[in-house]
């Protein structure tokens, strides 16, 4: 609900305001408190007189905001002096060595009500022992003069955001006012608009252990929203905790196309988009040409290593095309580039996976969707436990691969790298 004109009093937006960004601080414990008194809903009150820090949810929101902000053309940063706003700016790690503090970006002062509970009227109108709404609006309008410089980022509070929106004649939804949202205010021909920017959504298969788990952990730490697939959802819950606003789990069976379709549908329903797919799940049990070829095992290897990535690619491509910068990362193997052993099943299927990557790149190029092969040598996981060519401590670590995957996702369209070969033993280069 927009603030009424009477709330603003004589406050007016400054002249020559250019487009700017706004982030409401991450959540605090008071943000999450509410109660009913005599049948009326009351909310936790934290204004200029309450200087508390972010809770766990708020810190996570700041990390996600940072993922978005680091990709935007931020010109300068201006922050409220209150701890919850400063923490948000610091945790977001926007890339600025310093930023300005402006007292006028403080939240409205709620006087003796600070730290308690208040009814809707307290936030919508003048209320006993609270800062006058006109005086509050006047100082917010003064702070808005920073936006005379293009692409200024404000890190502030919900009340400040509502005043800015009212000054500019912009209607806000509940989604706009959520903690940690990155908002872009732009002036059109005759009016202002506001757009929400959210962090990318990445699907990762086989993410409950090994390389897949390391990939997911790294993406979470860098502010991505994830939809993770594994045979048993409970394994994902053990690995990453309960699902939440930014983390989604789904059953993924590489032999069951139905689970794949259901996963992609559920991810889109939750997040509204898909920005990237990491085909990580693989099967490495030996199918040896020197011995009797186990065709049942080979069939399973073919299905998991080739058919499942193909089906996931097919399902995700329409959504990836919509982003203009979709990414598919296939976790391949150096066995898809050369042959060092008689393990014909693994060698064949990994060569075939490379063919899928190349074909996907051919199909996706004009839609700005890139496919990348990351070809691994020996990685310190169960899949490499059989070799005596190199000690586990000298093998590639899962965390090394996770960083390469994130770099592949973040690399701009103008700098396509089709394949990364990752080695830990001396080999001839190709």
UniProtKB/Swiss-Prot annotation:
EC number: 1.-.-.-
Record key words, sorted: Oxidoreductase, Plasmid
Entry-linked PANTHER family: 3-OXOACYL-(ACYL-CARRIER-PROTEIN) REDUCTASE (PTHR42879), 3-OXOACYL-[ACYL-CARRIER-PROTEIN] REDUCTASE FABG (PTHR42879:SF2)
Gene Ontology biological process terms in this record: lipid metabolic process; monocarboxylic acid metabolic process
Catalytic site positions: 346 (proton acceptor)
Name of this chain's protein: Agropine synthesis reductase
Protein family (similarity comment): Belongs to the short-chain dehydrogenases/reductases (SDR) family.
Binding positions for NAD(+) per the UniProt entry: 203-227
Role this protein plays: Reduces deoxy-fructosyl-glutamine to mannopine.
Any single Pfam family the record assigns to this protein: His_Phos_1
PROSITE patterns recorded: ADH_SHORT
Pathway it works in: Opine metabolism; mannopine biosynthesis
Superkingdom of the source species: Bacteria
EC class of the enzyme, as a word: oxidoreductase
Organism expressing this protein natively: Rhizobium rhizogenes (Agrobacterium rhizogenes)
GO-annotated molecular function: oxidoreductase activity
Binding annotation for substrate: 333
């Amino acid at each position: 609900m927009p603030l009424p004109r009477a709330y603003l009093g004589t406050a007016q937006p400054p002249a020559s305001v250019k487009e700017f960004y706004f982030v409401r601080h991450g959540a605090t414990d008071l943000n999450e408190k509410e109660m009913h008194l005599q049948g009326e809903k009351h909310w936790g009150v934290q204004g200029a007189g309450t200087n508390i820090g972010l809770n766990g949810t708020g810190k996570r929101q700041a990390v996600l905001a940072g993922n978005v902000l680091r990709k935007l053309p931020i010109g300068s940063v201006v922050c409220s002096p209150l701890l919850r706003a400063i923490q948000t700016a610091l945790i977001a790690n926007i890339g600025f060595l310093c930023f300005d503090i402006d007292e006028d970006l403080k939240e409205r002062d709620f006087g003796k009500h600070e730290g308690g509970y208040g009814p809707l009227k307290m936030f919508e109108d003048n209320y006993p022992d609270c800062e006058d709404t006109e005086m509050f609006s006047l100082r917010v309008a003064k702070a808005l003069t920073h936006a005379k410089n293009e692409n200024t980022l404000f890190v502030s509070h919900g009340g400040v955001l509502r005043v800015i929106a009212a000054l500019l004649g912009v209607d806000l939804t509940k989604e706009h006012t959520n903690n940690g949202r990155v908002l872009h205010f732009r002036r059109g021909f005759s009016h202002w608009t506001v757009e929400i920017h959210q962090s990318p959504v990445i699907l990762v298969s086989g993410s409950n252990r090994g390389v897949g788990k390391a990939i997911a952990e790294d993406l979470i730490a860098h502010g991505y929203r994830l939809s993770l697939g594994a045979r048993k959802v409970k394994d994902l819950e053990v690995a990453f905790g309960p699902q939440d606003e930014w983390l989604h789990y789904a059953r993924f069976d590489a032999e069951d196309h139905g689970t794949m379709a259901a996963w992609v549908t559920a991810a889109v329903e939750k997040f509204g988009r898909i920005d990237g797919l990491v085909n990580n799940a693989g099967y490495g049990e030996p199918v040896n040409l020197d011995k009797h070829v186990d065709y049942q095992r080979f069939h399973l290897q073919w299905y998991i290593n080739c058919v499942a990535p193909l089906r996931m690619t097919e399902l995700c491509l329409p959504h990836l095309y919509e982003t203009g910068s979709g990414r598919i990362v296939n976790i391949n193997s150096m066995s898809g580039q050369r042959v060092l052993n008689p393990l014909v099943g693994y060698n064949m299927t990994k060569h075939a996976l490379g063919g899928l990557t190349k074909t996907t790149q051919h199909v996706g190029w004009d839609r700005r969707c890139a496919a990348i092969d990351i070809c691994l040598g020996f990685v310190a996981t169960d899949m490499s436990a059989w070799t005596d060519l190199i000690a586990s401590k000298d093998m590639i670590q899962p965390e090394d691969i996770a960083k390469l995957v994130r770099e592949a996702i973040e690399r701009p369209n103008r700098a396509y790298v089709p394949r990364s070969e990752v080695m830990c033993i001396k080999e001839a280069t190709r």
